């Protein structure tokens, strides 16, 4: 079992993997070369076969979405933006998609983190409290 001795983290790979898989959202990381490097387990709004790991992120998107994804990542790479939030509805459910630039301590671009969260629980909560 290999440990990760970061200044704010001392855990094993299996513990980190379990933590990421416990989060109630999809987590995807694309590196600075636009290669899919990670996504957590669980049901997905945006289907991701395990064969997507190690592949170019743009090859995993429908043609009409690719320019949008490319634009977001390019804006992160250039330092124009650090975050893009998108709300969408799919199959009648609201989703919050948050794209974030991942940077090191010197602000060097390392990649893009995508978080996708089903927001139906919030919609239901506020509907009940009316």
Show where each model-derived region lies.
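Sensory/regulatory domains in signal-transduction proteins
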Residues: 42-123
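PAS-family sensory domains
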Residues: 4-74, 128-130
């Amino acid at each position: 079992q290999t440990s990760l001795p970061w200044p704010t983290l001392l855990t094993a790979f299996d513990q980190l993997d379990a933590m990421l898989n416990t989060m109630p959202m999809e987590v995807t990381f694309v590196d600075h070369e636009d290669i899919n490097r990670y996504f957590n387990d669980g049901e997905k709004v945006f289907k991701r076969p395990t064969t997507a790991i190690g592949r170019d992120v743009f090859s995993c998107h429908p043609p009409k979405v690719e320019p949008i994804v490319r634009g977001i990542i390019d804006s992160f790479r250039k330092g124009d933006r650090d975050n893009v939030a998108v709300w969408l509805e799919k199959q009648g459910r609201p989703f919050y998609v948050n794209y974030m630039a991942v940077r090191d301590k010197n602000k060097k671009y390392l990649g893009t983190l995508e978080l996708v969260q089903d927001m139906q629980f919030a919609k239901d909560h506020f509907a009940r409290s009316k």
